[in-house]
Amino acid sequence: MVFLSSNQTMIQIILGVIIVSIGIFVFYKYPMKSDVRQMTLGALFVILAIILKRLAVMVPFLGFPSLKITLEVLPLIVAGLTLQPGYCFIVSIATDFLGLVLANAGGFPFLGLTLNAVLQTEIPCLLKIYLNEKNERLLERIVKIVMVIISLLGCLYVFKINEVNISGSSYQVTLPIKFTIFVIIAAMLTILFVFIRYYKNKLKEKDLCLFHLSILSVVAIELTVTMFLTPYWLQTMYGIPFFASQFVRILKSCVMIPVGIIIVYTMNRMIQKVIR
């Protein structure tokens, strides 16, 4: 939680309207049906997300201060790929609220972080609904195009910067560091395309669709929440410049995208086998 100034009141109101509007759309467009299995899975996802939120792994990378790697978003993505939209909305709100209660923070909650949680479940859920097995070729093309665009933009951004500020200290981004990051991004993209080709011949149509949805969901969340919304919320709450943390976030995404895809797909496939 953070204490808000009067200048942030309007942002809070706008965020509240957006969250309520998403809830109205979800419950109107996709009416909830009473389902014990969905409720049970939803409760498990909330518990898992809260537990992972309190755990973090510090990873040193290219001589920069350790990157804080957390996995609490992954159960929310899996929830989005597993549950109905209404249950996804409830899971995200419950996770955010209980996380704040357990953190025992004072002040009024910042609704931007609540919106993050909502999007982390609803984006995968809507992707699952609108990009199903009938759009398999389209889904594969979207995955490849999005990954190429993100990789090119990441390389362009890294190429243009020469210095980054992390935790109040300045670090030079030398040519060897830039080259190493380019290689990592290229390797990640190549491995992903190899995996897609490998699984395309090995998996059944439904499992292949699940694999593609896992890729697209993880990438979409990294792009919208991690790379765009979270820096904007930090700028709004604490005055941290939007681009100040982008370099570190690109490094973090190099780790989280492949790890997230593997975990999300594995968890989702296991759950699908159990509930079938």
Model-derived features: positions:
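Loop-helix junctions at membrane interfaces
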Residues: 1-276
